Design a protein with these regions (language model features):
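Glycine-rich phosphate/pyrophosphate-handling loop used in enzymes and phosphotransfer proteins
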Residues: 1-222
Length: 222
């Protein structure tokens, strides 16, 4: 099902009181933030039961399943982003696959509702296909994603400051995808303030693995 059909159901569910208590694994979604390779905010780490839940959610994107992630992410965004900027634009990172991952667009729509920012998916598109990168290291991912996006030019001559742009994706790994998307927008004179995502892949030393992942079969984590 296409994300425009799912987004209204998600937003309607999030606005209703009496949502069920989150599952036990959601207690680990305490919010994360970092500055490299670009400013980023995440609900939690991509590991354990949370990782398995995201994989299931990608195949069956239910509003109730996304809610714990949004609640884990929002405090970081409100403290570090929304309080410092006027309402800006939210751009989900697009997929080049015909059957696109629904989670970035669903998360972007939910964040717009909660933060009062505007959803603008049309600002960014894929300019070419890329290799599946779930077994690629950082340098190969950077090369794989370089030049893979094209952005709409920012309007010239408008009155007042141009709105900032927040990128949205489901998982942040090396940052190759996010950096390539941000570069395309910046080349068209948009100011990208960072990336909001559901989960951050643990660095080497956490769960005994580095920043590669075998979990996103079609696109691979960024």
């Amino acid at each position: 099902m296409a994300w425009p059909l799912l987004a209204p159901a998600l937003l309607d569910w999030l606005s209703k009181p009496g949502a069920p208590d989150p599952p036990a694994w959601a207690q680990d979604l305490q919010g994360l933030a970092g500055e490299q390779p670009l400013p980023w905010w995440a609900a939690g780490f991509y590991q354990g039961q949370a990782r398995h839940h995201l994989l299931r959610l990608r195949d069956n994107p239910r509003p109730a399943g996304l809610a714990p992630w949004i609640e884990g992410l929002l405090p970081q965004l409100e403290a570090n982003l929304a309080s410092r900027h006027r309402p800006g634009l939210v751009v989900p990172v697009p997929s080049w696959k015909r059957r696109a991952n629904p989670l970035p667009a669903l998360l972007a729509a939910a964040l717009c509702r909660r933060l009062g920012w505007r959803l603008q998916p049309q600002l960014l598109r894929r300019s070419r296909p890329v290799l599946g990168q779930h077994h690629l290291g950082r340098e190969l991912r950077m090369a794989n994603q370089r030049g893979a996006f094209q952005a709409v030019a920012a309007p010239r001559g408008q009155l007042g400051p141009r709105p900032v742009v927040l990128l949205v994706d489901d998982i942040l790994t090396t940052g190759a995808t996010a950096c390539a998307a941000a570069e395309a927008l910046q080349q068209q004179h948009w100011r990208v303030v960072g990336l909001a995502c559901l989960a951050r892949t643990p660095a080497r030393g956490r769960a005994g693995r580095d920043l590669t992942s075998d979990s996103r079969i079609s696109d691979g984590p960024g």
